[in-house]
From Swiss-Prot:
Its EC number is 2.1.3.15. The gene is accA. PROSITE patterns: COA_CT_CTER. It comes from Xylella fastidiosa (strain M12). Keywords: ATP-binding, Cytoplasm, Fatty acid biosynthesis, Fatty acid metabolism, Lipid biosynthesis, Lipid metabolism, Nucleotide-binding, Transferase. Its main location: cytoplasm. Acetyl-CoA carboxylase is a heterohexamer composed of biotin carboxyl carrier protein (AccB), biotin carboxylase (AccC) and two subunits each of ACCase subunit alpha (AccA) and ACCase subunit beta (AccD). This is Acetyl-coenzyme A carboxylase carboxyl transferase subunit alpha. It catalyses: N(6)-carboxybiotinyl-L-lysyl-[protein] + acetyl-CoA = N(6)-biotinyl-L-lysyl-[protein] + malonyl-CoA.
Length: 319
């Protein structure tokens, strides 16, 4: 099976292969298979729509991790008319799992920060599989405070399995770096829009996920733990990940129903990786609309609403 297809997409892969075979066969001048190709293309559209209308939480989790899914830098190349990356936390290093910088979207100057994964093994290692270390979150915080200083709206793109759990990260106080970002983002005196574009994993996602609007792409996920991690803890069996995915309620639709996010951004049929350009243009339009709406909210009201929405997530009681 083509590695760009997931298991549940096998019927789609088969139809696309048949269409390609017919097109190859019709390369000669005496062969005309246009009618057959059109019939198969229509069948393909209907079958794809049917499959993607009935996706399970586990299947959506797989789509959120698809190796061809657009990452932060892919969206930046389309959404932003200009982008100047800024590097380093000014303390230790430049964590490549977090990218960020000054950007312009249309006429709007913004600060943009996001997780970044890799396409091949070399880049995955360089990006640490999109799992930031403390210096990544401290770089993000530096850019957030820079945005606040210059009155720039902050946009974040979330796509990580979670924060890096290695000993080196713990030695540099990973939990403190995440906690500091949560505190600081809650008080930023600028509009903040957070968008989950792939995986939203635990505190590693939340460390750039506190804002005035939380958006999710249709086939993204947001959860305290991966389905495999949850299954390993609850049932001592990672093979039960599909059951865990259902119990975690990690899909955009479910989180919207719970009132934990503000908007679900529809993806092209088949997922964002099937038409990255269309997905990026759709995301750009939504972000510009949300920025325009937040422009009309006074700063005091903005902060009060941000604090109120954080309190609706739940409360901790010490008995």
């Amino acid at each position: 099976m083509n590695p760009n297809y997931l298991d549940f997409e096998q019927p789609i892969a088969d139809l696309e292969a048949k269409i390609q075979e017919l097109r190859t066969a019709s390369a000669g001048p005496s062969v005309n298979v246009d009618t057959e190709v059109r019939a198969l293309e229509n069948k393909l559209r209907l079958r794809t729509a049917q499959i993607f209308r009935n996706l399970s939480a586990w299947q959506i989790s797989q789509l959120a991790r698809h190796p061809r899914r657009p990452y932060t830098l892919d969206y930046i190349s389309v959404v932003c008319d200009e982008f100047q990356e800024l590097a380093g936390d000014r303390t230790l290093a430049d964590d490549k799992a977090i990218v960020g910088g000054l950007a312009r979207i249309g006429h709007r100057p913004v600060m943009l920060i996001g997780h970044q994964k890799g396409r091949d093994n070399k880049e995955r290692l360089m990006r640490n599989f999109g799992m930031p270390k403390p210096e990544g979150y401290r770089k993000a915080l530096r850019l957030m405070k820079l945005a606040e200083r210059f009155g720039l709206p902050l946009l974040t793109f979330i796509d990580t399995m979670g924060a890096w759990p290695g000993i080196d990260a713990e030695e540099r106080n990973q939990s403190e770096a995440i906690a500091t970002n949560l505190i600081e983002m809650a008080e930023l005196k600028i509009p903040v829009i957070c968008t989950v574009i792939g995986e939203g994993g635990s505190g590693g996602a939340l460390a750039i996920g506190i804002g005035d609007r939380t958006l999710m792409l249709e086939y993204s996920t947001y959860s305290v733990i991966t389905p495999e991690g949850c299954a390993s803890i609850l049932w001592k069996d990672a093979a039960k990940a599909s059951d865990a995915a259902e119990q975690l309620n990690l899909t955009a639709r479910r989180l919207k129903e719970f009132g934990l996010i503000d908007k679900v951004i529809r993806e092209p049929i088949g997922g964002a990786h099937r038409n990255p350009q269309q997905m990026a243009n759709r995301l750009k339009a939504v972000l510009l609309n949300e920025l325009e709406a937040l422009d009309k909210v006074p700063l005091v009201t903005l902060l009060n609403q941000r604090h109120k929405r954080l309190r609706t997530y739940g409360a901790y009681e010490n008995h």
